Amino acid sequence: VFLTAVLDALDGMVARIREISSRRGDLIDHTLDRVADIIIMGGIALGSLVDITVGFAAIIGILMLSYMGTQAQAVGAGREYAGLLGRADRLVVLVLVPTIQHFGYQDWNQYFSEGYLDWNYMTLMCYAFAIVCTLSAFYRFNKIWTELG
């Protein structure tokens, strides 16, 4: 995940500096970003720490947020980055939370009677991605809708 974040930050910058940026490069960049999102979050969703339903809800939220950004560009409103938990933010969270989960695991069940909730840091991250990314996608949609008049 860390390597993905570093490479994602560098690829566009290198293309601009070398003056070789192109629409095809932008297409490849966005496509590979979504593939990376699906692989990373799919691994988390299919892992043992997160309920698969919550994991896939996070994937849907992430993909909808990214889609709204690129769809704005497609309809002529310009690329839209508004809202919380954009790609850079998510990559930071995806580096920090698994690290905290690994080194600072806390049994959340001790705070809930009868242990009905089997929560951990990864589960909380996926809930946050599902909810915040979906709300940010709606925010982007509304902003784009307003701009299009």
Name these PLM-found stretches.
Residues V1-T4, S22, D26, G55, ...:
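A generic hydrophobic-helix recognition signal that picks specific residues
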Residues L3-V6, I28-L32, I60, A88:
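Hydrophobic residues within alpha-helical transmembrane segments
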